[in-house]
Amino acid sequence: NENSSVTTREQKKQTIYTDDAGQRMVIKNHNGYVSYTNYAKEIAEARHRSLYDSLNLSFDRLKLLDVALDDVRYSEFDFQSKNATYRSYINGFPIISADEYGSYQVQITDSGNQHLVFSLYTLQVPVPADSNAVQLPNTDDVMESLKQSGIDMQKINNVQIGYRESKNESSALVIDLTPTYFVKYNNVWIDYRDLVHNEEGSR
């Protein structure tokens, strides 16, 4: 809204922007993590919005960010929170990052409020890693290692192969991508190795 006034403040290593039109944006200074909320109700209320309509609305909001979406695909939709997730894909597999690199969360509530989470740092052209190929275990072995570590298997919602990002030691502008299994545990995606190690370490 061109006529609204924007207020900026710094708090706990993050920059917060608000205006009198019901918009709020928080940027974490150390990693470019962005959380944007719009309470202006630009979208009509709908208690029983269909999946088709929800995804159309979320993708329309995503396009308004004016970012390159060449490698970005729809990943999943949470019916309870009305949250749609879009991720960057490489060779058919998603990048799953705690810092939201390459991913976009778009939530449109029944009341019409909008909430977007993404990173200011977009992924550019992927380049092959110099390291040797990674040999992943089969899914049965992954599930068995989770079970043996004492994980509550009832809390696992999904398992899939994806790329884990890590900082490149030679350049701050490059991230390394390593294939691994991700487990959706308590509705949070986590590398299965971290889940196993955390559980074993808590014993």
Question: Predicted segments — roles?
Answer:
Residues 1-64:
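Preferential activation on post-signal-peptide N-terminal prodomains/segments
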Residues 60-68, 145, 149:
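Structured segments of extracytoplasmic/periplasmic soluble domains
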Residues 107-138:
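Short helix-loop boundary/capping segments
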Residues 25-37, 98-117, 189-203:
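A short, surface-exposed beta-strand/turn
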Residues 132-203:
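Hydrophilic extracytoplasmic domains
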Residues 87, 116-119, 184, 193:
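Beta-strand residues in well-ordered beta-sheet regions across diverse protein folds
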Residues 2-26, 68-111, 160-188:
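Exposed beta-strand-loop-beta-strand "reactive/processing" segments of non-cytosolic proteins
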Residues 22-27, 41-48, 91-98, 123-128, ...:
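Short, surface-exposed beta-strand/loop "edge" segments at domain boundaries and coil↔beta transitions
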